[in-house]
């Protein structure tokens, strides 16, 4: 109480620590001279031109693997809406709102991206819930792009990582992410990150291309149990194990959610 007599004694701010690890991945390619001579194509040039896309898929796979592990942590059970355990296993018009409110409560507006299977996207289209926002990308040539949104959230449609099982038994996972869900930092101090080598002896000549990338890709609000990681870089399996993560901050600070559902008759 600011009554002119009571001391305003500072209170120390307390908190916890997050532990993360650098994830390092590598890939090498090779092509025989014979292949180039036979086809007239240059496979190594093609590979070099596509290496950014290759690693883009690598990191996408790592991120989704971490997300599914984190959302299986018991302390984050409210962040998962599993419709497959109920009588109505399909999504409805209000499913998104139920999921984000259960996960973040009064901070539910913090989830702005949905990653879903094409079958689930189809169900939302049948409910006429899909809108499209137009954006102008400035560059050498101005280009207008259109991005889908559902309930004000941007949508990424991919059949990778978003379904298990098949047919009527298929379970679809729709992920919701908010800004700051992951902490990320690239490793930029590699020596010889991309290296070429030519072996003139083997198979009458082989071109080799060695690559490696490293990145911190950490779920914000949790800590990775580094004592459970066998080597200096965690494996895909280690990052995908929910027991290797522990909650460090309030659950509302974890900007992730998950909806598990099947495909049925959409209800509005």
Residue ranges of each PLM-predicted region?
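Intrinsically disordered or highly flexible coil/loop and linker segments, enriched in small
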Residues: 1, 60-64, 215-223
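Assembly/oligomerization interface modules of large self-assembling protein complexes
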Residues: 1-25
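Structured, hydrophobic secondary-structure cores that serve as assembly/anchoring elements
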Residues: 23-39, 43, 96-126
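Oligomerization/assembly interface segments of phage tail-like spikes and tubes
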Residues: 24-27, 50, 207-209
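Short loop/turn segments at secondary-structure transitions that flank enzyme active sites
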Residues: 26, 35, 57, 120-122, ...
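Alpha-helical scaffold segments that mediate packing/assembly in large oligomeric complexes
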Residues: 34-106, 243-245, 252, 261, ...
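Short, flexible loop/turn elements at secondary-structure junctions
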Residues: 51, 118-120, 213
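Sequence/fold signature of self-assembling virion shell proteins
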Residues: 84-94, 125-268
